[in-house]
Curated annotation (Swiss-Prot):
<dbReference type="GO" id="GO:0046872">
    <property type="term" value="F:metal ion binding"/>
</dbReference>
<feature type="binding site">
    <location>
        <begin position="36"/>
        <end position="37"/>
    </location>
    <ligand>
        <name>4-CDP-2-C-methyl-D-erythritol 2-phosphate</name>
    </ligand>
</feature>
<keyword id="KW-0414">Isoprene biosynthesis</keyword>
<comment type="function">
    <text>Involved in the biosynthesis of isopentenyl diphosphate (IPP) and dimethylallyl diphosphate (DMAPP), two major building blocks of isoprenoid compounds. Catalyzes the conversion of 4-diphosphocytidyl-2-C-methyl-D-erythritol 2-phosphate (CDP-ME2P) to 2-C-methyl-D-erythritol 2,4-cyclodiphosphate (ME-CPP) with a corresponding release of cytidine 5-monophosphate (CMP).</text>
</comment>
<dbReference type="GO" id="GO:0016114">
    <property type="term" value="P:terpenoid biosynthetic process"/>
</dbReference>
<feature type="binding site">
    <location>
        <position position="10"/>
    </location>
    <ligand>
        <name>a divalent metal cation</name>
    </ligand>
</feature>
<comment type="similarity">
    <text>Belongs to the IspF family.</text>
</comment>
<dbReference type="GO" id="GO:0019288">
    <property type="term" value="P:isopentenyl diphosphate biosynthetic process, methylerythritol 4-phosphate pathway"/>
</dbReference>
<feature type="site" description="Transition state stabilizer">
    <location>
        <position position="36"/>
    </location>
</feature>
<dbReference type="InterPro" id="IPR036571">
    <property type="entry name" value="MECDP_synthase_sf"/>
</dbReference>
<feature type="binding site">
    <location>
        <position position="144"/>
    </location>
    <ligand>
        <name>4-CDP-2-C-methyl-D-erythritol 2-phosphate</name>
    </ligand>
</feature>
<feature type="binding site">
    <location>
        <begin position="102"/>
        <end position="108"/>
    </location>
    <ligand>
        <name>4-CDP-2-C-methyl-D-erythritol 2-phosphate</name>
    </ligand>
</feature>
<feature type="binding site">
    <location>
        <begin position="10"/>
        <end position="12"/>
    </location>
    <ligand>
        <name>4-CDP-2-C-methyl-D-erythritol 2-phosphate</name>
    </ligand>
</feature>
<keyword id="KW-0456">Lyase</keyword>
<feature type="binding site">
    <location>
        <position position="12"/>
    </location>
    <ligand>
        <name>a divalent metal cation</name>
    </ligand>
</feature>
<feature type="binding site">
    <location>
        <position position="141"/>
    </location>
    <ligand>
        <name>4-CDP-2-C-methyl-D-erythritol 2-phosphate</name>
    </ligand>
</feature>
<feature type="site" description="Transition state stabilizer">
    <location>
        <position position="135"/>
    </location>
</feature>
Length: 159
């Protein structure tokens, strides 16, 4: 069986008046995240993990922030495109594990909704999707409530 592991990491700074989107879910908070696209840091980390697993670079290569075509882009669309590239190479998801690193907002009320969005976008069982959150105990930029970081690890298997 041919399997691949991909790791993704992304960070965005709080700011602006756009809604806070995390994992395709609108999370109530006083501000959104600054980004060229819609700023969904969760989906960006996952997209990088998918692309990394199949040796296709990163989202910056596929959707450069210098290209106005991607200004305000829907990150769910970007993720589905990345996953299609993996499927075109014969791979499907085995499982996904995501860690959201944020002091604010509290993520627990939103974890299940994020898992459900990801399950639909990957067309896989909910049991294959794990999302968790942690803080840095008020240390660093996330602890100072300046932004959010996300790590994602995905296992892809040859279909």
């Amino acid at each position: 069986m041919n399997i691949r592991i991909g790791h993704g990491f992304d960070v965005h700074k709080f700011g602006g008046d756009s809604p806070l989107l995390l994992g395709g879910v609108n999370v109530p908070y006083e501000t959104g995240l600054i980004a060229h696209s819609d700023g969904d840091v969760v989906l960006h980390a996952i997209s990088d993990a998918v692309l990394g697993a199949v040796a296709l670079g990163d989202i910056g290569k596929h959707f450069p922030d210098t290209d106005d075509d991607f200004k305000g882009a829907d990150s769910r669309h970007l993720l589905r495109h990345c996953y299609q590239l993996a499927k075109d190479k014969g791979f499907v998801i085995g499982n996904l594990d995501v860690t959201i690193i944020a002091q604010v907002p509290k993520m627990a009320p939103h974890i299940q909704a994020i898992r459900e969005v990801l399950s639909r976008d990957f067309a896989t069982d909910l049991d294959n999707i794990n999302v968790k959150a942690t803080t840095t105990e008020k240390l660093g930029f996330t602890g100072r409530k300046e932004g959010i970081a996300v790590e994602a690890v995905i296992l892809l298997a040859k279909a």
